[in-house]
UniProtKB/Swiss-Prot annotation:
GO cellular component: plasma membrane
NCBIfam families, sorted: amt
PROSITE patterns (UniProt xref): AMMONIUM_TRANSP
Recorded GO MF terms: ammonium channel activity
Protein name: Putative ammonium transporter MTH_661
Membrane topology: Multi-pass membrane protein
Record field: transmembrane: 9-29, 47-67, 70-90, 101-121, 129-149, 162-182, 196-216, 226-246, 257-277, 279-299, 312-332, 357-377
Keyword terms, alphabetized: Ammonia transport, Cell membrane, Membrane, Transmembrane, Transmembrane helix, Transport
Coiled-coil annotated residue ranges, if any: none
C-alpha cells in the first residue's frame, strides 16, 4: 500500500495534539490543583517526563514494543534508531511513514508517565522521580504495550485497546496507587487547588488534544477516525454532566472541579473503546465512568486511607477499567474490521472474557512491579522530601524558584 498524504498530514497533527496534552495539558491541570508553593514542581514533573521518555523511546522503547514478537512477552532484540526506516511505510499503519508511527506512539508513553506524577505531587523527591521514570518505563510500560499493541500474548488472546485504556490509563492509575501507598500520605492531605483557572485551561487542552489521542489512533483519516472523534466528545460531555449530578446529589451544589474531573473521566473511559462503539454506548460509558469514579474519589479513597493526591487511580485507573470492559459489552463489528466478534449486547461473550483477562493481567502486573520498584527506591534512595521541605513548599526547596512573586 502506498503512503497517503492525507493520512500522513492527519497523523502529524495528531502527534502534535497528544504532545499538547502532556505539556502543557496535564502540567497545567495538575498544577492548578496543588498549593501555590508547589506549582512549578508539579509542572516540572510532567515536563521532565516528556523529555526523558522521548529519548528512551528511540533508544530502546520502540524496538522492544513494535520491533517483532519474542514468545509473546517482549519485542525484538533490535533496538535503537536504526530499527526505524523513516521513509518506508509502517507495518502497523501502511499509509504513513514508520517514523511518524513511531513518534505518535512515543507521545502515549510520555503522557502515561506524566499522569502518574499526580499521585505523589507535593512530597516526592525530584531526583527520585528522575530515577523512577526510566525504570518504570522499561519494566512496566514497554512490556505491557507490547502485550497489547505489539503482537504480544494479550493481543493474541483477543484483547482490544483502541487508544490506551489499558496501556495508558490502567497502567498509570494502578502505578499511581502503588507509588502513593509506598510514598505515604502528605502531612496536609486537603485538596486545596490554588488556581482552578489553570486546571480549566489544562482540561480544555486535554479535551482538545484527546481528539488526536483517540481519533489519531485510527492511524488514517477516514470514517473510523471520525467515529472516534465523535464518541470521544460525547463521552467527555456525558462524564462532565454525570459528575455535576453526583455533586448536586451529595452536596446540593455543583462544582467546577467536579465538572473538570467528570470530563476527564469520560475522556479516559472512552479511550479503549473509541474505535469500537457507537454514540449511544459512548454516552453510557461516560456517565457510568463519572458515577463510579466519583465514588472511588469521594468514598473509596478516604475509606482505604491512601493519599492519591490528584486522584490518578480514582479517575484514570478506574475509567480505564470501565472503558476496557465496555468494549466487551458495546463493541460493534461493523465499525471496525479488526473485531472478529461483537460485545455482549450483540450476543457474544468471548470479547468480554478477553477484555477481563487483559484488565486483570495488566492490573496485577503493574501493581506488583511498581510496588517493588517503589520499595527499592524508598530503601536505597528515599522517595519523599523532608517534612520541613514539604511544609515550606517544593518550588523553593528543590528548585530555588517560586511560581509567584507578589509585591
Amino acid at each position: 500500500m502506498m503512503l497517503n498524504s492525507g493520512d500522513t498530514a492527519w497523523m502529524l497533527i495528531s502527534t502534535a495534539l497528544v504532545i499538547l496534552m502532556t505539556v502543557p495539558g496535564v502540567a497545567m491541570f495538575y498544577s492548578g490543583l496543588t498549593k501555590r508553593e508547589n506549582v512549578l514542581n508539579t509542572i516540572f514533573l510532567s515536563f521532565v517526563s516528556l523529555g526523558i521518555v522521548s529519548l528512551l523511546w528511540f533508544l530502546f522503547g520502540y524496538g522492544l514494543i513494535f520491533g517483532g514478537d519474542v514468545s509473546g512477552i517482549i519485542g525484538s532484540h533490535q533496538v535503537g534508531i536504526s530499527l526505524i526506516n523513516l521513509g518506508s511505510a509502517s507495518k502497523y499503519a501502511p499509509t504513513i511513514p514508520e517514523g511518524l508511527f513511531a513518534i505518535f506512539q512515543m507521545t502515549f508513553a510520555a503522557i502515561t508517565v506524566a499522569l502518574i506524577s499526580g499521585a505523589v505531587v507535593e512530597r516526592i523527591k525530584f531526583s527520585s522521580w528522575i530515577l523512577f521514570i526510566p525504570l518504570w518505563f522499561a519494566l512496566v510500560y514497554v512490556p505491557v504495550a507490547h502485550w497489547v499493541w505489539g503482537g504480544g500474548f494479550l493481543q493474541n488472546l483477543g484483547v482490544h485497546d483502541f487508544a490506551g485504556g489499558i496501556v495508558v490509563h490502567i497502567t498509570s492509575g494502578i502505578a499511581a496507587l502503588a507509588l502513593a501507598l509506598v510514598t505515604g500520605p502528605r502531612y496536609d492531605q486537603k485538596l486545596m487547588p490554588h488556581h482552578l483557572g489553570y486546571s480549566v485551561i489544562g482540561t480544555g487542552l486535554l479535551w482538545f488534544g484527546w481528539f488526536g489521542f483517540n481519533a489519531g489512533s485510527a492511524l488514517s483519516a477516514g470514517s473510523l477516525a471520525a467515529n472516534a472523534m465523535i464518541v470521544t466528545n460525547t463521552s467527555a460531555a456525558a462524564g462532565m454532566i454525570g459528575w455535576i449530578l453526583m455533586d448536586r446529589l451529595k452536596t446540593g451544589k455543583p462544582t467546577l472541579l467536579g465538572a473538570l474531573s467528570g470530563a476527564v473521566a469520560g475522556l479516559a473511559s472512552i479511550t479503549p473503546a473509541a474505535g469500537f462503539v457507537d454514540i449511544g454506548a459512548s454516552i453510557v460509558t461516560g456517565l457510568v465512568a463519572a458515577v463510579i469514579c466519583y465514588l472511588a474519589v469521594s468514598w473509596l479513597k478516604p475509606a482505604a486511607g491512601y493519599d492519591d493526591a490528584l486522584d490518578v487511580f480514582g479517575i484514570h485507573g478506574v475509567s480505564g477499567i470501565i472503558g476496557t470492559l465496555g468494549v466487551g459489552l458495546f463493541a460493534v463489528p461493523a465499525l471496525n474490521p479488526s473485531l472478529t466478534s461483537g460485545g455482549l449486547l450483540t450476543g457474544s461473550t468471548s470479547l468480554l472474557v478477553s477484555q477481563l483477562i487483559g484488565v486483570v493481567t495488566v492490573t496485577v502486573y503493574t501493581f506488583v512491579v511498581t510496588y517493588i520498584l517503589a520499595m527499592l527506591l524508598m530503601k536505597f534512595k528515599g522517595l519523599r522530601v523532608e517534612r520541613e521541605e514539604e511544609i515550606q513548599g517544593l518550588d523553593i526547596n528543590l528548585h530555588e524558584e517560586t511560581g509567584y512573586r507578589l509585591t
